[in-house]
């Protein structure tokens, strides 16, 4: 057999297998009225007389019935004994009493009855016991809404569901009782009834007064309707005049919008041109062309480092390019200040820039002193770049490059002296930030053969600082000239 809910196979309790015929007949007979009540076609109740002996056996077994075979409680609610098919065997089970009498338990009776039945009917079919059990389960199914048989677990789940339904029904009953009690408590008294009747009569009087007021208002409405007709006619005339006004106003607004669009366009062009002019006036072509800054220990011009350290070796092409930019800066500033170098002709050519030095021979060195003035000056080319093949510290290997850097310092000194003479006349003389004396600038030699790496790098940094000073002076001269021209 299988459980009718979870379809799992069942093992029947031993009490069902050994159920005696008397108890079986009593159970079937007690269930017959319920079965007939559930039938769709009503049948007249059939009288089923019970044998007095069977009745006495049933009463005796019921009095001696012990506890159920399976008994489980859920919380504080005990299980109802009528909700489990297992409890059907309680009518046949009894606790054994300690006695010396021979056993008279239902098991012995069932065995005797079973053996007698088998002896009387030796040809009875083997499935008769199963038919009796199926009949018993059909009776149980007819008495309830649940199909039997069911297992213990499903029975527990069924009992839990019924307990929940019982709790819900109990809460609903309590709620209905509470509402009924409140309704009875809120029943109006005689005084309340009198008060309500008085309020009703007052409301009737107010209603009559309101009806009189309504009649007056209706008469006023009639007169207002006549006045409204006249006002509507006047409104139509005003609508025509308003339409004419808006047509003329829209034409004027269209012309005004065209004029404003043209004005905004002209204003936008003027604003853009003004901003561009102001930007150009504030711009400094010298600072934009020659950006002198620093990168750690190195001075830079346009991002090119000028100097070299043992722990940070700078490539010689970068150094040569930096010298080329610095020489171009001096030439540009000299042209702006209208100054011509004395005895030098700088030729900026990028990484291969050079300085031409003119040496005029002294009169004592010439055999003919009277003709010394006609002798052309001697021309020396100073290369302001190095290939980097020669190591630092060897004086004779860097002589040409050293002479070129000394010549560069001389150009800076001459230009600084010229600026000093010009500004001295205005009362605020300007001088180079560092003093230049031969191959030294600020007591640091610029020659590679004499100075170490850090000394030469420092001398290059001081040189670019002086160049930045000259560049700033040229920018001020340009700004002053522009401001004076605009005034």
UniProtKB/Swiss-Prot annotation:
Its main location: membrane. One of its GO terms (biological process) is mitophagy. It holds the Pfam family APG6. GO terms for cellular component: endosome membrane; phagophore assembly site membrane; phosphatidylinositol 3-kinase complex, class III, type I; phosphatidylinositol 3-kinase complex, class III, type II; vacuolar membrane. Residues 283-480 are annotated as: BARA. Belongs to the beclin family. Required for cytoplasm to vacuole transport (Cvt), autophagy, nucleophagy, and mitophagy, as a part of the autophagy-specific VPS34 PI3-kinase complex I. This complex is essential to recruit the ATG8-phosphatidylinositol conjugate and the ATG12-ATG5 conjugate to the pre-autophagosomal structure. Also involved in endosome-to-Golgi retrograde transport as part of the VPS34 PI3-kinase complex II. Autophagy is required for proper vegetative growth, asexual/sexual reproduction, and full virulence. This is Vacuolar protein sorting-associated protein 30.
């Amino acid at each position: 057999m299988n459980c009718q809910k979870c379809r799992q196979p069942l093992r029947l309790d031993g009490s069902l297998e050994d159920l005696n015929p008397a108890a079986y007949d009593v159970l079937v007979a007690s269930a017959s009225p319920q079965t007939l009540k559930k039938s769709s076609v009503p049948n007249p109740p059939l009288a089923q007389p019970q044998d007095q002996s069977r009745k006495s056996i049933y009463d005796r077994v019921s009095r001696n019935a012990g506890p159920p075979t399976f008994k489980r409680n859920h919380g504080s609610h005990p299980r109802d004994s009528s909700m489990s098919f297992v409890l059907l065997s309680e009518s046949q089970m009894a606790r054994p009493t300690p006695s010396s009498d021979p056993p008279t338990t239902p098991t012995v009776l069932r065995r005797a009855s079973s053996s007698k039945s088998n002896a009387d009917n030796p040809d009875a079919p083997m499935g008769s016991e199963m038919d009796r059990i199926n009949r018993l389960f059909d009776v149980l199914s007819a008495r309830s809404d649940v199909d039997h048989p069911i297992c213990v677990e499903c029975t527990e789940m069924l009992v839990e569901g019924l307990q929940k339904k019982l709790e819900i029904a109990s809460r609903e009953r309590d709620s209905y009782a509470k509402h009924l009690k409140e309704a009875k408590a809120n029943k109006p008294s005689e005084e309340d009834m009198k008060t309500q009747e008085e309020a009703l009569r007052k409301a009737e009087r107010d209603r009559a007064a309101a009806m009189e007021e309504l009649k007056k208002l209706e008469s006023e409405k009639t007169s207002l309707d006549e006045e409204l007709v006249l006002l509507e006619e006047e409104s139509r005339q005003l609508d025509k005049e308003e339409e004419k006004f808006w047509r003329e106003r829209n034409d004027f607004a269209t012309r005004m919008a065209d004029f404003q669009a043209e004005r905004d366009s002209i204003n936008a062009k003027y604003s853009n041109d003004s901003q561009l002019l102001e930007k150009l006036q504030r711009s400094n072509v010298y600072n934009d062309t020659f950006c002198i800054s620093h990168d750690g220990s190195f001075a830079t011009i346009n991002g090119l480092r000028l100097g070299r350290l043992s722990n940070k070796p700078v490539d010689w092409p970068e150094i040569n390019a930096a010298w080329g930019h610095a020489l171009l800066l001096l030439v540009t500033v000299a042209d702006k200040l209208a100054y011509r170098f004395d005895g030098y002709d700088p030729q900026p050519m990028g990484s291969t820039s050079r300085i031409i030095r003119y040496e005029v021979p002294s009169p004592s060195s010439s055999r003919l002193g009277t003709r010394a003035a006609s002798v052309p000056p001697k021309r020396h080319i100073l290369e302001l770049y190095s290939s980097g093949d020669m190591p630092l510290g060897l004086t004779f290997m860097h002589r040409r490059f050293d002479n070129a850097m000394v010549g560069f310092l001389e150009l800076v000194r001459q230009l600084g002296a010229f600026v000093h003479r010009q500004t001295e006349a205005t009362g605020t003389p300007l001088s180079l930030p560092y003093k230049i004396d031969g191959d030294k600038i600020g007591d640091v030699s610029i020659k590679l053969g004499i100075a170490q790496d850090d000394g030469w790098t420092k001398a290059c940094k001081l040189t670019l600082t002086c160049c930045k000073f000259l560049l700033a002076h040229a920018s001020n001269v340009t700004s002053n000239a522009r401001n004076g021209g605009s005034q």
